[in-house]
Amino acid sequence: ANEPKDELRINFCIDPIIKSLSVKGTCGCKENERNCFDVIAELVKATAEYKRVKVVNVSGATFSNAGSTIVEELAFTLSAAHEYLVKLMEKGLTIDEVARKIRFTFAVTANYFLEMAKFRAARMLWANIVKAYNPSKDCSMKMVAHAVTSTWNQTVYDPYVNMLRGTTEAMSAAIAGVHSLEVLPFDYSFEAATEFSKRIARNSQLLLKHESHFDQVVDPAGGSYYVEVLTVSIAEQAWKLFNEVEDNGGFLAQLEAGEIQKAVNASGVKRHTDVARRKEILLGTNQYPNFTETALEKIDKAGCCCCCSEGEEGGVEALKFDRAGSEFEDLRLATERSGK
C-alpha cells in the first residue's frame, strides 16, 4: 500500500485473444468477447497512474511452442497486439493509454542469433505500429518484452541436455535486452519440477547476471553485422506476413477462419519432419542418443506439462501442441513397455 506509484510492478497477464482463444478454442461467443474487452478497458483506466502495471500480456510464446517459425511467431503476436489496440481504442481509450499497458511474452528457442534478432525486430515493428496512431509520448512506442525458454525442444530422454538448451536460450534473451526472463526447469516436460530442477533454472539466470554481467551492457549485439542483417531480414518477413493478416480482416478474423491455426500447425508438421530427417538436431534424441537410458518410470502424468491443447464445442479450432522429440520418444517408450 505504501509502494510509490512509479515503482509498483504488477502484470495481470490478461490475454483473451491468444491464450484463451488459441489454446482453449473458446472464441465462439461474441458477447463474451465484448465483455472481455470491457473488463480490460476498465482495468486500463483504473491503473492509468501506475506506469509499471501491465494489464494485457500478448502470449506470443503460444505460437512458438506449437511449432511456428520465428517469423510467424513475431507476425501473429504483433497482429494480436494490434487487435488489442483497435478494440480498446474503440472503448474510448487513447493510443498512449492502451500501448503502455501491453506486455509481450515470447518463447526463446535454441536458435541463438535468430532469437537475438527476433527481439530486436519485434521492438522495431511494434514502434512502427504504435507510431501509426500518432501517440503523444514516445515512450508509448516502447515494447516491454518477457522471454520464457521454449517447451518445443525440451526432451524426456537425456533431460540434462535441457539445462544446456535453457542456458543458451536465456543468454540469447539477455543479450537481446528483454525486460524479464523465465527459465523453465529441465524436467518441465515430464514431471512436476523438483527442488533441484527449479534451483538450476534460477541459478542459470543468476550466473548470466552476476558472472557474465549481461544486465550491465546496453544492446551488446548492436553493431554486429550478422545480427543486424538477421534483424532486418526477420523484420521484413514478419512485416509482410503481418500486413497479409491485416489485409484479410485482422487477427481475430483470421483466427476464426482457421487460417492462423492452419499456418502454425503446418509449420509444426514440417518441423517434425525435419527432426525425423535430422535436418533439425535434438541432441540426445535424434543425435547421439543413449540407448541404454530408460524414461518410462520417471514420467509423472500428474505433473506432465506437455501443453496439450483442447478445443471447446462452438469455439474456434485450437492449435496443436507437441514437442519436437515426441515422435522419437513415443517409439522408445513403446519399446520399453514391450519389455524388449
Residue ranges and their predicted role:
Residues 1-3, 14, 27-45, 158-164, ...:
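Phosphate/diphosphate-binding loops
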Residues 1-109, 133, 142-146, 174, ...:
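Catalytic alpha/beta active-site cores
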Residues 17-22, 62-68, 91, 95, ...:
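Flexible loop/turn segments at secondary-structure boundaries
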Residues 43-44, 48-87, 167-242:
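Mobile "lid/hinge" segments at catalytic clefts and subdomain interfaces of large enzymes
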Residues 60, 106-108, 147-149, 184-187, ...:
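Active-site proximal loops enriched in glycine and acidic residues that flank catalytic Cys/His/Asp
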Residues 68-74, 109-121, 150-163, 191-201, ...:
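Short glycine/threonine-rich loop-to-helix capping motif typified by GTGT followed
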Residues 179, 240-340:
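Intrinsic disorder at enzyme termini
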